[in-house]
Amino acid sequence: MQIHLVFVGKTVFPDVETGIERYVSRLNHYLPTRIHYVKAEKIPPRGMESAVLEKECERILKLIGGKSNQLIVWDRTGKHLDSLEFARVLERLSNGGTGAVWMIIGGPLGISRELRDRANLVLALSEMTFPHDLARLIVAEQLYRAFTIIRGEPYHK
């Protein structure tokens, strides 16, 4: 199985980018993991948000094309899982012969309805709102944590 992390827009804070890269490097010991960046649109005037989300959605769908075996979208409206439940989801996907898992973290306006509807799973990080850079770091860390749980390694306590 491969993991593809799709981020809308660039990571702003270099220290956060370093943290994301560190977790992705650790993840690569378990399975191939790649980060893909999709261009973010500028924040539009009020009432034009859906047009921006549609453009970003088009870019994401062009990137993943027909390659997506599993699409997981991170969105505030998603399901809440703890780390053990998230590990079980990934373990089922891995054991089920899933070739690739595409995980999408949207930009400042979130994720389009079309992407949420296409997703096999919509997950939320928290009831709280996080900066997108921090959300990316949390997802990368939780992926690493999940695979240490699956392997029975001592990282997760």
UniProtKB/Swiss-Prot annotation:
Q: What terms describe the molecular function in GO for this protein? A: rRNA (pseudouridine-N3-)-methyltransferase activity
Q: Quote the InterPro entries the UniProt record gives.
A: Alpha/beta_knot_MTases (IPR029028), RlmH-like (IPR003742), tRNA_m1G_MTases_N (IPR029026)
User: Its biological function?
Assistant: Specifically methylates the pseudouridine at position 1915 (m3Psi1915) in 23S rRNA.
Q: Which GO terms describe its cellular component?
A: cytoplasm
| Name this polypeptide is given | Ribosomal RNA large subunit methyltransferase H
Q: Assembly and partners? A: Homodimer.
| Record organism | Syntrophobacter fumaroxidans (strain DSM 10017 / MPOB)
Matching HAMAP family, A to Z? 23SrRNA_methyltr_H
Q: Which UniProt keywords apply?
A: Cytoplasm, Methyltransferase, rRNA processing, S-adenosyl-L-methionine, Transferase
| Primary localization class, coarse | cytoplasm
Name its cellular compartments: Cytoplasm
Q: Can you tell me which family this protein belongs to?
A: Belongs to the RNA methyltransferase RlmH family.
Q: CDD domains, from UniProt?
A: RlmH-like
Q: Could you tell me what reaction this enzyme catalyses?
A: pseudouridine(1915) in 23S rRNA + S-adenosyl-L-methionine = N(3)-methylpseudouridine(1915) in 23S rRNA + S-adenosyl-L-homocysteine + H(+)
Q: What EC number(s) would the UniProt record show?
A: 2.1.1.177
- Where does this protein hold S-adenosyl-L-methionine? 106, 125-130
Instruction: Give, as one word, the top-level EC class.
Output: transferase
